[in-house]
């Protein structure tokens, strides 16, 4: 029969609510195209200082650009000097003196360019750092201010990854590229002004060049911006999906889900790749049109100039040469607009995506200052006729005309089935949501009229699945003091309060035993603590501020019986004088409540005290009977609050000596630890990185061939110009028809050059984007796949938080896209042009060529390579620093309910901003140093042009080279300098691409310890039993000095049901991790069917094992998808295959598994049934519903070994009873071996063997009856949970 209560869905209180769409199709919504309005808005985030810096920088860039154009005047005078010498007007000595004087102007220009280019690059880059910092700050502030429903809808994308990756795109488009743009525009304008002054008629003809070029660039950039925006949207949702996968990496390993999930991730990438392919013809058009238009205009100008000269409209050849050189300079700088326009387009698209969230007004804004803040809080809570449906499912009513009065200072308990609305009341009291109708009051005031921050600071919450933040234990508990008078107290005062709260939560003792006590770092989401330890720290965090209203949503669900009893007493004490609302499935924890409210279907079924409800013999009494344990307590067996008894004390004495490992073992542990450290990796240089990228995708050979041929054709542009312009000078020595005929011929040659540019750059633009999009797709998929291959200890490392990893998944492939797109073509063309121009110079005038090429090119290239090397180191450092800020953002947004309930939005934002400020400040000095190298790359060309001009004229005057040869050689050197200067304008993209390639290559070759190898490929686990543990000792790899298991000996036979019980942190869950082979023993061994576990193929072994975790992990997708992921299919294809084992699971199998987990009733009652989206992390389901889906996923696997780590901790009493029967049946199904960790002893009392852990060892072992008779630790645990 269907349970109607279950149809009233309660979205989870789980924290993994970041933002994947609730629906499965379409993959992304169509977004609005980013406009350059978004680009302009970027600069509204600049402060006064940044605006001043930008203004100074732009002036410097314009001056630098003017300097580029002023060389045309020098060239004009140079032609006059040449003409005078050729015509015999000046002597060789005068010729050399005049040449030396003109050469000095080049030296001065070089010095000016050095100062100006250094100035504008440094100032603009620093200003961009600050602007992007402000945008990221505003973005995270907006994210933290959104109401919880925003995340329920999956509206956010991966917020942390977007803040980092989109910030990098904005940085790229709002820093030095602006200076290069203004420099180019200034050079273009100045060159045309010079040309107008010299010969206005001829210059007017050349106006067609910029008009056509800018028009083409504008149209293409607008269309391309729309595609870029769409790609960013798809990648944002792909990143969010990846975030959910990485957050649940243990489940991925346990069930072998990697290939299926990566394939699902790839569906997003395929969609993005389709859009990316549409950019290829646009880039082909953009580059080919620019160069073609320029050379067509150039040919037209030369043809017209010759004819005007022949008609006497132009007086001297020098004027034509000055105009033509001005057109060349203007054209060269105009061609740079194309790649810059793409950078600006990407920056605009990235900014527009961030601005959408920044502009969104939250319905419940925690930053708001409005609302009442009463001076005194009594704690009277009243819900009056409250009706509520979650925004994601408006058709399902969770609370229906619900009314409840909670008197001040009293304890009110809420019990009932999962999905009955208990946790919904908590969400409404915390103002995560507003009721659909009805009123909620605190001390008579509508909570909607109270200040949100004030309300949450006075109504504290401990959640069912507590979330801690990266940092120390002290930091986490101190968060509870935010917004109180003790927030800014001294550390000593805060520590005193923190310790008092920890003692109240029965956490002080275990915290004191940690390596660094309260300063011990606990890892991402508190991952280095056990579930019970995390829960106690969360309780301490909530009570440290001494709130007037306390909400406990299954606050003791993860505690062992002894700790639960003590903590419950502490909570009972803490509840004195304050209003407490308790949600509990363990009825022992609420029997002393002043009022127990039994809920079902959003209504109150019955309420009263424990005694009155027992006497009524109704629903509550039935639940109590289910949980009672058969223990006859005696007076002397009462729970001892101070210790576990004498037997425990003896154990402690024996354990103190076992704390160190032999040197060889420690050496092995350190080597494994160092292996996962990227900083120890030897980095590839640029050529090796490029070679790796080419080798990685051999299917792109055709595209690389097209690019190479196109680059070879494109590199002929500058040498061709040098030869043609040298011939132009010869034309002016002729007269009459001969001059016009030669002029027409060379003008037609420029048209041929334009045609060649059209073909070459069309091919290059199309092929490079094809390569870039393919590599981006491939490496996004590969980097996630390779991350999921790694051992669990890889994810335990501080630098490998979920947020940091997702940021790398997004930013590194994009860096490769930038490198291997048009940038690599421009770099290759520039390199080939330097080489060909150098060869041409040496060929026509070997003395001049050798002196200038080997005197000027090496220092220029050297300065550029030094910049790339320094820039690469800086990029690695800043990426690491920004990774820290990304981790803060990721954990805050993933834990949005915890952040909001603690009202610590400002604190999180301050931490995030401090990390951003640290990243900016620490980058300034090395960035300023790299800019010196950049300045040198921009000025050295002028210095070797000066050398070439002076030495070349000297050779001409001495008759050692002809005038034509000198012109060819000198112009070749001039164009080589232009090419080399352009080459290093893209050094930032080069360094980022090289660093990204290095990380991806390192990760790809990094082999996990737990993997399939040729040696173990055919070694299976046999029958899966017996399992024997021989003196197993274990310390987590990152905490070698903190032993968890201290010599465990155990044998589990086929078909047995074994239970592990004991206090939190004693090693129970670690045993499960050992059996799942998340880690290997530090010393000792585990054997399966007489084979050592480390010698068995881990894939084959895990195929016979199923795991249900204490905090179940679900992934974005439907309920069906999540259960299907539990099925092992021996024919599963690798991730790059289109086949998927998940699709082969029948609906009948799904239904059978759901029925076994007591989940079929609630699933079948949903409108979409098994095709209902579970949401990111299962956020659309309640905790109990998620747990049952996880159990169904384990049961559908039909495992030989079933591992249950608090598998029923989130279930209500009735569901637990049914599911427990199913699990017991599953445990006795055939020869299945079952290992269960449990704090609810009623769930394991029928186990064949119960192992009581204490201090990393098995203290007691036996059946339930045997251990009760023995009267030790286990008996006292049972007494703590007895209800009668």
UniProtKB/Swiss-Prot annotation:
InterPro entries: AAA+_ATPase, ABC1_TM_dom, ABC1_TM_sf, ABC_transporter-like_ATP-bd, ABC_transporter-like_CS, P-loop_NTPase, Type_1_exporter. Pfam families: ABC_membrane, ABC_tran. Residues 1-24 are annotated as: Disordered. Keywords: ATP-binding, Cell membrane, Glycoprotein, Membrane, Nucleotide-binding, Repeat, Transmembrane, Transmembrane helix, Transport. The chain crosses the membrane at residues 55-75, 99-119, 178-198, 203-223, 282-302, 320-340, 705-725, 745-765, 824-844, 846-866, 931-951, 955-975. It is found in: Cell membrane. GO terms for biological process: transmembrane transport. One of its GO terms (molecular function) is ATPase-coupled transmembrane transporter activity. Residues 381-626, 1027-1280 form the ABC transporter domain. Residues 1-11 have a biased composition (Basic and acidic residues). Residues 55-346, 705-992 form the ABC transmembrane type-1 domain. Induction: Expression is strongly increased in the presence of cycloheximide, imazalil, itraconazole, hygromycin, and 4-nitroquinoline oxide (4-NQO). GO terms for cellular component: membrane; plasma membrane. This is ABC multidrug transporter atrC. It comes from Emericella nidulans (strain FGSC A4 / ATCC 38163 / CBS 112.46 / NRRL 194 / M139). The gene is atrC.
């Amino acid at each position: 029969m269907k349970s109607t209560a279950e149809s009233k869905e309660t979205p989870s209180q789980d924290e993994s609510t970041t933002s994947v769409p609730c629906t499965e199709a379409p993959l992304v919504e169509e977004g609005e195209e980013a406009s350059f309005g978004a680009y302009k808005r970027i600069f509204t985030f600049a402060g006064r200082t940044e605006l001043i810096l930008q203004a100074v920088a732009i002036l410097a860039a314009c001056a630098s650009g003017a300097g580029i154009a002023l060389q045309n005047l020098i060239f004009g005078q140079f032609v006059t000097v040449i003409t005078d010498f050729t015509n015999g007007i000046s002597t060789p000595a005068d010729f050399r003196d005049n040449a030396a004087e003109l050469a000095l102007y080049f030296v001065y220009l070089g010095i000016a360019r050095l100062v100006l280019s250094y100035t504008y690059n440094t100032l603009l880059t620093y200003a961009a750092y600050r602007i992007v910092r402000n945008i990221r700050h505003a973005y995270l502030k907006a994210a933290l201010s959104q109401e919880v429903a925003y995340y329920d809808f999956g509206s956010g994308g991966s917020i942390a990854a977007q803040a980092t990756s989109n910030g990098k795109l904005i940085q790229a488009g709002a820093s030095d590229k602006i200076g290069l743009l203004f420099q180019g525009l200034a050079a273009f304008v100045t060159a045309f002004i010079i040309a107008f002054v010299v010969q206005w008629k001829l210059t007017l003809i050349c106006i067609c060049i910029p008009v056509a070029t800018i028009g083409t660039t504008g149209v293409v950039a607008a269309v391309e911006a729309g595609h870029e925006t769409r790609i960013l949207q798809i990648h944002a949702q792909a990143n969010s999906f990846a975030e959910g996968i990485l957050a649940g990496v243990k489940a991925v390993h346990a069930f072998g889900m990697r290939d299926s999930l990566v394939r699902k991730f790839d569906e997003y990438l395929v969609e993005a790749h389709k859009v990316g392919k549409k950019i290829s013809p646009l880039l082909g058009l953009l580059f080919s049109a620019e160069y073609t238009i320029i050379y067509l205009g150039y040919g037209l100008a030369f043809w017209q100039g010759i004819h005007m000269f022949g008609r006497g409209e132009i007086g001297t050849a020098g004027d034509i040469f000055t105009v033509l050189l001005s057109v060349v300079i203007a054209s060269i700088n105009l061609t740079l607009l194309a790649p810059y326009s793409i950078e600006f387009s990407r920056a605009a698209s990235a900014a527009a995506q961030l601005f959408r969230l920044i502009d969104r007004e939250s319905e419940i804004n925690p930053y708001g200052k409005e609302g009442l803040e009463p001076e005194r809080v009594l704690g009277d809570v009243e819900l009056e006729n409250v009706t509520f449906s979650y925004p994601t499912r408006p058709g399902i009513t969770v609370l229906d005309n619900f009314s409840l009065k909670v008197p001040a200072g009293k304890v009110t308990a809420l019990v009932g089935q999962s999905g009955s609305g208990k946790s919904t009341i908590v969400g409404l009291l915390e103002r995560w949501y507003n009721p659909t109708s009805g009123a909620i009051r605190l001390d008579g005031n509508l909570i909607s009229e109270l200040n949100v921050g004030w309300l949450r600071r006075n109504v504290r919450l401990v959640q069912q699945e507590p979330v801690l933040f990266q940092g120390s234990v002290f930091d986490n508990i101190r968060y509870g003091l935010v917004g109180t008078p003790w927030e800014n107290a001294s550390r000593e005062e805060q520590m005193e309060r923190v310790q008092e709260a920890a003692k109240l939560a029965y956490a002080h003792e275990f915290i004191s035993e940690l390596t660094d006590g309260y300063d011990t770092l606990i890892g991402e989401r508190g991952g280095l603590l056990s579930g019970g330890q995390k829960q106690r720290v969360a309780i301490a965090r909530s009570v440290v501020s001494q709130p007037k209203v306390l909400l406990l949503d299954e606050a003791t669900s993860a505690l062992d019986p002894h700790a639960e009893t003590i903590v419950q007493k502490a909570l009972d004490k803490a509840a004195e004088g304050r209003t407490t609302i308790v949600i509990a499935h363990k009825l022992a924890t609420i029997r002393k409540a002043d009022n127990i409210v039994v809920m079902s279907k959003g209504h109150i079924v019955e309420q009263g005290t424990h005694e009155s409800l027992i006497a009524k013999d109704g629903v509550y009494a039935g639940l109590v009977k289910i949980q009672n344990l058969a223990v006859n307590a005696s007076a002397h067996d009462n729970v001892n609050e101070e210790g576990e008894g004498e037997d425990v004390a003896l154990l402690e004495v024996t354990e103190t000596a076992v704390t160190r490992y032999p040197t060889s073992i420690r050496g092995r542990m350190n080597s494994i630890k160092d292996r996962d450290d990227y900083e120890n990796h030897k980095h590839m240089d640029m050529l090796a990185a490029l070679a790796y990228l080419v080798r990685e995708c051999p299917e792109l050979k055709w595209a690389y061939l097209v690019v190479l041929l196109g680059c070879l054709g494109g590199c002929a542009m500058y040498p061709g110009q040098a030869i043609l312009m040298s011939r132009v000078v010869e034309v002016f020595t002729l007269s009459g028809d001969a001059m016009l005929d030669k002029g027409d011929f060379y003008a037609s040659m420029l048209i041929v050059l334009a045609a060649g540019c059209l073909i070459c750059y069309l091919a290059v633009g199309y092929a490079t984007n094809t390569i870039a999009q393919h590599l981006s797709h491939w490496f996004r998929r590969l980097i996630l796949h390779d991350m999921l291959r790694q051992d669990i200890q890889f994810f335990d490392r501080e630098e490998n938080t979920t947020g940091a990893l997702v940021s790398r998944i997004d930013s590194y492939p994009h860096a490769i896209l930038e490198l291997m797109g048009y940038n690599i073509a421009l770099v290759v063309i520039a390199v080939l042009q330097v080489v060909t121009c150098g060869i041409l110079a040496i060929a026509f005038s070997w003395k001049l060529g050798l002196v200038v090429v080997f005197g000027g090119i090496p220092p220029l290239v050297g300065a550029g390579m030094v910049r790339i090397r320094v820039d690469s180191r800086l990029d690695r450092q800043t990426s690491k620093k920004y990774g820290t800020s990304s981790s803060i953002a990721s954990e805050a947004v993933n834990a949005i309910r915890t952040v909001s309930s603690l009202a610590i939005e400002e604190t999180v934002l301050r931490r995030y901003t401090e990390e951003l400020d640290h990243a900016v400040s620490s980058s300034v000095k090395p960035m300023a140093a790299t800019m010196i190298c950049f300045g040198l790359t921009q000025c050295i060309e002028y210095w070797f042009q000066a050398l070439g001009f002076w030495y070349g004229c000297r050779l001409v005057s001495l008759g050692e080279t002809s005038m034509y040869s000198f012109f060819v050689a000198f112009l070749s050197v001039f164009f080589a300098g232009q090419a080399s200067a352009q080459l290093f304008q893209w050094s930032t993209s080069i360094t980022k691409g090289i660093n990204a390639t290095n990380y991806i290559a390192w990760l790809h070759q990094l082999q996990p310890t737990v993997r399939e190898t040729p040696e173990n490929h055919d070694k299976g686990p046999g029958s899966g039993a017996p399992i024997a543990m021989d003196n197993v000792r274990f310390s987590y790899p990152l905490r070698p000095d903190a032993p968890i298991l201290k010599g465990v000996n155990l044998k589990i036979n086929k078909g047995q049901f074994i239970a592990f019980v004991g206090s939190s942190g004693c090693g129970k869950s670690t045993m499960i991790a050992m059996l799942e082979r998340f880690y290997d023993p530090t010393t000792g061994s585990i054997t399966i069917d007489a084979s050592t576990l480390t010698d068995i193929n881990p894939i084959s072994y895990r195929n016979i094992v199923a795991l249900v975790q204490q905090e179940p992990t679900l992934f974005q997708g439907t309920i069906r998808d999540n259960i299907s992921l539990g099925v092992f299919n021996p024919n599963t294809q690798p991730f790059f295959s289109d086949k998927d084992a998940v699709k082969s699971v029948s609906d009948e199998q799904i239904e059978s598994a759901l029925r076994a987990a007591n989940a079929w009733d609630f699933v079948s009652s949903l409108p979409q049934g098994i095709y209902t989206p579970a949401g990111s992390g299962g956020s659309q389901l309640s905790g109990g519903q998620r747990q049952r889906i996880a159990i169904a996923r384990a049961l559908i696997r039909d495992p030989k070994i079933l591992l249950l780590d608090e598998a029923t901790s989130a279930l209500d009493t009735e569901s637990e009873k049914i599911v427990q029967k199913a699990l017991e049946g599953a445990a006795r199904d055939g020869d299945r071996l079952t290992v269960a960790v449990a704090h609810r002893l009623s769930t394991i009392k029928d186990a064949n063997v119960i192992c009581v852990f204490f201090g990393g060892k098995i203290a007691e072992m036996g059946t339930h009856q045997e251990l009760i008779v023995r009267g030790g630790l286990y008996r006292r645990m049972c007494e703590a949970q007895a209800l009668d």
